[in-house]
A protein has these predicted regions:
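Active-site metal-binding core of divalent-cation-utilizing nuclease and nuclease-like domains
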Residues: 25-94
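Conserved catalytic cores of phosphodiester-cleaving nucleases, focusing on short active-site segments
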Residues: 54, 98-106
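Short, solvent-exposed amphipathic alpha-helical segments in soluble enzyme
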Residues: 118-121, 151
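Conserved catalytic-core segments centered on acid/base and nucleophilic motifs
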Residues: 102, 124-125
């Protein structure tokens, strides 16, 4: 079974996990880097995206929004042009505000792959500090995964995609991290509100 087949079977077993306004889908483009570019006419903000295997998210940009259609405005004046840097294969999906990301590997990845995915998690968490990044390996987990996957919130082993108990554990794990992400976001928001309240006194 290919990695994409495992992913598609998994999403079929997870699709009822959350309800609106949250979504759970595959191959969701998630921002990992923002680049500001000054120009003579208007400044530009480039939003670069990674496509993630399975994501619990809210919509940031609808999939119908094209690469250069978004802007930051003040009244009727455009202040910044927004450029969505995503490949054409990502245009069939909404661009997401991630709460839980589940990255899937069919076999135990090598050290270089683990480091790459861990760095990817770090970049995403820099923009979305509340986001939970889970790393799922279909099969056993080697010790090097724990040594090098320092930015993963949890490393999961799935050995049989048709085992109801394993799927239940996975569902419970995703919901646990979804709750953690929402609580973290609340904490971040409360701190901002409290800070603003202090500055008004």
């Amino acid at each position: 079974m290919k990695e994409t087949e495992i992913r598609d079977k998994l999403i079929d077993k997870l699709k009822d996990l959350v309800s609106e306004p949250y979504l759970i889908e595959t191959e969701v483009p998630i921002p990992y880097k923002h680049i500001y570019i000054p120009t003579e006419e208007r400044n530009k903000l480039e939003i670069w995206c990674f496509k993630q295997d399975i994501v619990i998210y809210k919509k940031l940009f609808d999939k119908t929004v094209k690469q250069s259609e978004s802007k930051i405005t003040k009244g009727k004046e455009t202040i910044v042009d927004i450029i969505l840097e995503k490949d054409s294969g990502q245009n069939s999906h909404h661009l997401g505000l991630p709460f839980v990301i589940l990255e899937l590997k069919k076999h135990q990845p090598n050290t270089h792959e683990i480091l790459t995915y861990s760095q990817k998690a770090e970049m995403i968490k820099t923009i979305f500090p509340y986001c939970q990044f889970l790393f799922l390996i279909y099969g056993g987990i080697a010790a090097r995964t724990y040594r090098h996957g320092i930015n993963f919130d949890e490393i999961i082993s799935l050995k049989n995609i048709n085992d109801r108990n394993e799927i239940k554990v996975l569902r419970d794990t995703l919901l646990k991290h979804f709750d953690i992400a929402k609580a973290s976001l609340t904490t971040l928001t409360e701190r901002k509100i409290k800070k603003n309240n202090r500055s008004l006194k």
